[in-house]
Design a protein with these regions (language model features):
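Loop/turn elements at helix/coil->beta-strand transitions in domains of secreted/extracellular proteins
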Residues: 55-59, 88-93, 132-138, 170-176, ...
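Solvent-exposed loop/turn segments at secondary-structure junctions
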Residues: 65-69, 76, 98-104, 142-148, ...
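N-terminal module-boundary/linker segments of secreted carbohydrate-active enzymes
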Residues: 48-78, 247, 251, 257
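Conserved SGNH/GDSL esterase-like catalytic core that processes O-acyl groups on lipids
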Residues: 58-60, 66-157, 190-194
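Active-site segments of SGNH/GDSL-like serine hydrolases
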Residues: 140-144, 164-194, 216
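Extracellular serine-dependent O-acyl
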Residues: 174-179, 191-225, 235-258
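Secretory targeting and sorting signals
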Residues: 2-48
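Generic structural signal for well-ordered alpha-helices
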Residues: 125, 159-164, 196, 200
Length: 266
């Protein structure tokens, strides 16, 4: 009876060699997949969005979730405002470190930060301004100072400081400061009124490039979806107010005049 001989591996097929061969095949496969991904056309989720950074007048929408465009209408007032400005023939470039909104919004950039207070904007504003160099700023802020009960009595002073930092960094900017929209229920509705009452004097003290926008008068509690954030119709009302304010200050929709170069000495 013949004994069973032990099986022998094929020459050159040691375990170490097999591992090297497997790794080589995996590397080749990974390279092929990478090439295929690069060759595929971009999907709508990652493709460049027409109108972004289009060389127009740089406008920074600045604020909290109302600027971001909290549900039920992502993009908020920025959607209709962009459409209105573009429809009137203005070439504008919304700027900011944030980006979101629906396809009908031609430029998704902004500085709307959900849940943020005045002091949080103030802590970041210089970096944002230096990064984006806006010609015009639309500022709606203070709602979260009230909702978070963050030393509300001092909120106007914090707003004044924020404005000072904006003007110190960009002295030629056109800054539009809103009296913020109402809220449903007490005591917040009254707190909004108290905060808003201080804003006109603050704006008047900041010079000719700072403009008061009475957003509070444009919306009622019926325009709110959840007691704080507007419905789509409410955001459309906000867009109309911003649009009217911008149109009333032609410089806000025009590039900053170029500074003439100094004459060279002969």
């Amino acid at each position: 009876m013949r004994g069973t001989l032990p099986r022998r591996g094929r020459p050159g097929r040691s375990p170490a060699a097999a591992r090297r061969r497997a790794l080589s095949l995996l590397a080749a496969l990974a390279g092929l997949l990478a090439a295929l991904v690069v060759a595929l056309p971009q999907t709508s989720a990652v493709a460049a969005i027409p109108g972004e950074s289009n060389g127009g007048v740089r406008i920074m929408p600045l604020g909290d979730s109302i600027t971001d465009g909290y549900t039920p209408y992502p993009g908020g007032y920025r959607v209709t405002l962009w459409q209105d400005l573009a429809g009137a023939g203005h070439l504008v470039d919304f700027v900011g470190s944030q980006t979101n909104g629906p396809a009908e919004l031609g430029d998704h950039d902004h500085e709307g930060h959900p849940g943020w207070r005045i002091d949080q904007l103030d802590a970041n504003i210089v970096g944002w301004l230096n990064a984006t160099d806006p010609r015009t700023i639309l500022l709606h802020i203070g709602t979260n100072d009230i909702n978070q009960d963050d030393d509300v009595a001092d909120a106007p002073a914090r707003l004044s400081t924020l404005i000072d930092h904006i003007l110190r960094t960009k002295p030629d900017v056109q800054l539009f400061v809103a009296r913020i929209i109402t809220e449903q229920g007490e005591p917040h509705a009254t707190m909004v009124n108290t905060y808003n009452a201080a804003i006109p004097d603050i704006v008047a003290s900041k010079g000719p490039n700072v403009h008061l926008v009475d957003m509070h008068a444009a919306l009622t509690a019926d325009d709110l979806a959840d007691g704080v954030h507007p419905k789509q119709e409410g955001y459309d009302k906000m867009a109309a107010v911003w649009d009217s304010a911008l149109e009333s200050v032609p410089a806000s929709l025009q590039p900053l005049p170029a500074t003439p170069a100094p004459a060279s000495a002969n």
